Amino acid sequence: MSLSQFIFIDMKNILKYKDYREYMQDVYNERKRTSVFSWREFSALAGFTSPIYMKLVCEGKSSLSKTKMGRVAQSLGLEGYEREYFEQM
């Protein structure tokens, strides 16, 4: 499962972002705005066991390795140039 099945109407295009943390936070905020969503669910979608791992990343208290970056990109449903851009941020 990934977040790609959800339509994010108020999201900026990923190319407008310079920081993956800001993009992840906006995805979380938009998903939370339109339904019940939690950091636990966001972390689980990316395959992390810590329920607050994604929150820690967005707050700058933890970083994503290249491997983890790929897992997050997949959970966000990013493909092609969007995935490449995300992984280079």
What are these language model-derived features?
Residues 2-40:
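A short, Lys/Arg-rich alpha-helix, primarily the initiator
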